[in-house]
Amino acid sequence: MATLGGVSASRTRSGPVREWVTFEDPADDGRRWQIDVTFLTSHWECIFGRGCQGVFTEPAPEMVQGCCSYGAHFSNRKDRDRVVRAARELSDDEWQYAKAGRAKGVYAKCGKDEEGRIEWRTRLVDDACIFLNRPGFAPGAGCALHLHAMRSGRHHSDLKPDVCWQLPLRCVDEEQEDGTVVSTLSEFGRDGWGDGGAEFAWWCTEAPEAFTGREPVYRSMGEELRKMLGSDALYDQVVTYLDQRASAQPPPAPHPAETPVQFTRRRPGTNGSRRKH
């Protein structure tokens, strides 16, 4: 259950009011979750190939690269090895760069973390992720791993890198002085990209055109949310709470990109005041 007093509205660094709810983790006594009610009850949806402008300093919808232009950074070795195994399943008609991937591998070094450990990401081919099929490829542009998941009847989170299937959700763990951990599950904003995110001409969680889904995020991304929370019991608690919160009054604090802007049009010949009869 949500902890007593766990619901709050607070301001993020970018300014807008955002609503949160706090849960104790039933599977981990030392972990507490802060859940972004505002984003999870919004109607964001991925619009890859349907208006996505990409992640460049200038809009580039014609490239149909989505957020795949810089490769995917692996969260750990387990993540990397899972993707390597998935790549072995891909056929030539699913993967445009199959020949390159099989010849040189699908990952490459990309620097070191703060502790000096080597970091890895998916290899780049023609200035984008090796798994990204480009416009003109027979099945269409998009992720080869995602395509294979659809064809094989699996969820794409079983095959794609963690960061890819989680987007635009993001979980950040913060260890407290008493040794407990606070896990904050919210949207993946520009800051998730590091310093370069601020230079993007467009980002989907700020774009009203991406908030047109038929279901709220916690429903449309239910499988992703379940895996990120790590336990069915916690997932069920979160969904039950959000179902109740979404139908309650007043409604949850709205996402700034989803809030409609209303304009008042004056009738010709009036100064905006009511006309006397």
Segments and roles (model prediction):
Residues M1-H277:
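Short loop/turn segments that flank or connect secondary-structure elements
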